[in-house]
Amino acid sequence: MSTHTETPVDGSAETITGAQPYEAGFTESSAGRVYTVTGGDWEQVLGVGEDDGERITVNMGPQHPSTHGVLRLVLEIEGETVTETRLVIGYLHTGIEKSCEYRTWTQAVTFLTRADYLSPLYNEAAYCLSVEKLLGITGEVPERATVIRVLVMELQRIASHLVWLATGGMELGATTGMIFGFREREKILDLLETITGLRMNHAYIRPGGLAQDIPDEVIPEIRAFLDYMPKRIREYHALLTGQPIWKARMVDVNFLDAAACLALGTTGPVLRAAGLPWDLRKTMPYCGYETYEFDVPTALEGDSYARYLVRIEEMGESLKIIEQCLDRLRPGPVMVADKKIAWPSQLAIGSDGMGNSLEYIRKIMGTSMEALIHHFKLVTEGFRVPAGQVYTQIESPRGELGYHVVSDGGTRPFRVHVRDPSFVNLQAVPALTEGGQVADVIVGVASVDPVLGGVDR
């Protein structure tokens, strides 16, 4: 009958009969001993752990609810301290970039809008701006189309930050913040559905302009939202900004200064929370952003709490831009005049809301054979883009979203590469989490706000 020794709290030893032996190779350390977390024996526990150099490797994800998707974190921990963080990605790879090579320039939009599924309009905008540069029609895009692009992008910036607020609040136990965030996001999704026909994956921004004009009836709804949302932002401040538990979990946690951000290539709120006012809408304007009045919120602390404050303030600045967009809306076309590119500019909105105008269908089917042939070839074959390559970057809710688009002169993209900000910003997670507590890993990932659809593509 095998025995082993258990050391009670009072330090005396007694022999326990009937105990099963441990696996071969175990050392006489803390195995089989009973300890308390207070008292004289706790120092002995710490000493044993240090002498043996024991580390535990744990997996956080890819099914963990706090990883914002199918992200796997391999953590090496000593006690409650994270000594090493390794990221494993690729679980959500769908081959979006490669699929674009087998579709026309316009059809590729329907793939790319599914990359970062929380801000699909930004993928559409960055891609279409790239194609327009290759076509040499950047200056020909109608002003109304450009204003509407800015309008819908800023609406989606607020919606994306609201998801970050809701999911981050849920992960830290602030369930009221989760309810508030999704409540306001639902109102924005209703507006985007009225404008584009879909709540997400819109395929609304097209090379040369937009798929369709903005409905007149949505303008009063947007203005009502502009009156409603500032009150809700003040509500978030009242609920969370000064909340002791919220601050205790975020202040001086997951610190990353400006130098580290630049070394790692991080952009967006993570970089601005470290004190650098880098916003492509200001530094490298596109879509006429240089004509809009808004500020770039920054903070100096570089911790998770600073990133929270930056995103909250950005929602207020987006409201300013949206209001200016509504004031600038003037009647006019929303697609370039070149009929060799402007698909589907002639497909006005029909009763089904999906662009099947019976009036235009009757025209091309019954009165103009040439129009029918042109429409058929434009839809099935697509337009040709001159050979060349271009890189376009815009400021998405998560940072710099870049598109490198290459054309060989054909009707399909030769190569489309996405520089997704979530992919780059995730490289900062080890720097944010190593040396901290296990519980702070969740805060660190949430403060980066990654979307795995854009990371894996």
From Swiss-Prot:
Mode of membrane association: Peripheral membrane protein
Keyword Nuclease found: no
Annotated EC: 7.1.1.-
Q: Which UniProt keywords apply?
A: Cell membrane, Membrane, NAD, Quinone, Translocase, Transport
Q: Which reaction does it catalyse?
A: a quinone + NADH + 5 H(+)(in) = a quinol + NAD(+) + 4 H(+)(out)
GO cellular component term of the entry, any: plasma membrane
Q: Where in the cell is it found?
A: Cell membrane
Tell me yes or no: is Transcription among this UniProt entry's keywords: no
Name the top EC class: translocase
Q: Gene3D superfamilies, from UniProt?
A: Cytochrome-c3 Hydrogenase, chain B
Record region (Disordered): 1-23
Q: Which GO terms describe its molecular function?
A: NAD binding; NADH:ubiquinone reductase (non-electrogenic) activity; quinone binding
Q: How does it assemble?
A: NDH-1 is composed of 14 different subunits. Subunits NuoB, C, D, E, F, and G constitute the peripheral sector of the complex.
Family stated for the protein in its record: Belongs to the complex I 49 kDa subunit family.
**UniProt cross-references to PANTHER family, sorted A to Z:** NADH DEHYDROGENASE [UBIQUINONE] IRON-SULFUR PROTEIN 2, MITOCHONDRIAL, NADH-UBIQUINONE OXIDOREDUCTASE 49 KDA SUBUNIT
**Functional summary from the UniProt entry:** NDH-1 shuttles electrons from NADH, via FMN and iron-sulfur (Fe-S) centers, to quinones in the respiratory chain. The immediate electron acceptor for the enzyme in this species is believed to be a menaquinone. Couples the redox reaction to proton translocation (for every two electrons transferred, four hydrogen ions are translocated across the cytoplasmic membrane), and thus conserves the redox energy in a proton gradient.
Q: What is this protein called?
A: NADH-quinone oxidoreductase subunit D
Species in which this protein is naturally found: Parafrankia sp. (strain EAN1pec)
The primary gene name is nuoD
